[in-house]
Structure formats: structure tokens, C-alpha cells
UniProtKB/Swiss-Prot annotation:
Record protein name field: ATP synthase subunit delta
Entry-linked InterPro entries: ATP_synth_OSCP/delta_N_sf, ATPase_OSCP/d_CS, ATPase_OSCP/dsu
Taxonomic lineage of the native organism: Bacteria, Bacillati, Bacillota, Bacilli, Lactobacillales
Membrane topology: Peripheral membrane protein
Subcellular location: Cell membrane
Cellular component annotations (GO), alphabetically ordered: plasma membrane; proton-transporting ATP synthase complex
Gene it is expressed from: atpH
Length: 182
């Protein structure tokens, strides 16, 4: 039975993570994978070329070596492994799953700060540091989403946790209390 894309990503990312960890090159492999992810997203033809069964393996190896010379040996070995087992079509899913494992291991969280107006980098950084400290994360990487309907304040979404400090929600709570106390 053929494996689904998610199963392939899960298995291969776990194998890469364990391999990089054993070789004490987890951070280097993580950097390499993020470079690859960026390149793959900007050049989708690259994955099509490396996944194409018509193109000979030695041509694919030449192509790979043309841009992988700065990667760690563990990353190069992993790319060769993907080439050997014809799994390049799953590369982006594998990298995303690897990044999730890496973030969990390093206690790094990602989330969204929803605000009525765009937050500058300093504001986003202060919110990120305060939340990370309060909830025990080593680091919190926040992206800002603007939603004028919240009127003011902030809604933080990190993992399955939502902290709603918006004026809209506070006004709704006050309204409900007033109706309740009639």
C-alpha cells in the first residue's frame, strides 16, 4: 500500500531529525532545510525536475551538486537518500514536518498577534518576549495580522491557545453583564 504524503513527511522528517541529532548537526541541517524550502517555494520547477522519472539519476545528481555544495554533509546525504528513493516530490512537506520537530525540541513556538493596526517590529518583539517568558517558551515567533474589527487591543493565537485582549471582546462582555443585571 502506498504511503500518503503526510506519512512520508512524518517518517522522513523523523529520520532526518534523528540523523542530524546523532551527528550533532541539528542546527546546521535546520538552516539548510530552510534554505531548501525557500528555494523550492521560489522555484517549483526544481522539485518537478528532481521528481521526474524520465530524467536520469546522474543528471539529477549533477543538478543537486550545483547548489548543495554549501550544505552540511548530513543534508547532502539526506538529499541523496531522497533522490535514491524518489521522494523529492515530498520535500516541502518533509521540511515543514522537520521544522515542527525542531521547534518542539528547541521549545520554539509560532503564533499570530491580531491587532486593529499594524504592529511595528519593536512592539511585536516585546509582546513575543513577554508571552514566551510567561508561558515558558525559549522563543516565540509572532506574525502580525491586522483586523480593524477588533477595535483595539490584541488577540494572541499560539498553538491551541488564544488570549483575547481585544476591545471588541471586552465590550461584548460588558454588554452581556449589563443585560444580565437588568
Amino acid at each position: 500500500m502506498a504511503l500518503s504524503r503526510e506519512e512520508i513527511a512524518s517518517r522522513y522528517s523523523k529520520a532526518l531529525f534523528a540523523y542530524a541529532q546523532d551527528a550533532n548537526s541539528l542546527d546546521a541541517v535546520h538552516e539548510d532545510m530552510n534554505v531548501l524550502l525557500q528555494v523550492a517555494k521560489e522555484n517549483p520547477d526544481m522539485l518537478r525536475l528532481l521528481s521526474d522519472p524520465i530524467i536520469r539519476k546522474n543528471q539529477k545528481e549533477e543538478f543537486l551538486s550545483s547548489f548543495s555544495d554549501k550544505f552540511s554533509s548530513e543534508t547532502k546525504n539526506f538529499l541523496d537518500f531522497l533522490l535514491e528513493y524518489r521522494r523529492f516530490e515530498s520535500l516541502t512537506a518533509i521540511i515543514e514536518a522537520f521544522n515542527t520537530l525542531y521547534d518542539e525540541y528547541k521549545n520554539i513556538a509560532s503564533g499570530t498577534a491580531v491587532s486593529a493596526i499594524k504592529l511595528n517590529e519593536d512592539e511585536l518583539s516585546r509582546i513575543s518576549q513577554a508571552y514566551a517568558k510567561k508561558y515558558g517558551f525559549k522563543e516565540l515567533i509572532l506574525t502580525n495580522k491586522v483586523d480593524p474589527s477588533i477595535l483595539g487591543g490584541i488577540i494572541l493565537k499560539v498553538g491551541d491557545r488564544i488570549i483575547d485582549g481585544s476591545i471588541r471582546t471586552r465590550l461584548q462582555q460588558i454588554r452581556e453583564q449589563l443585560i444580565e443585571n437588568r
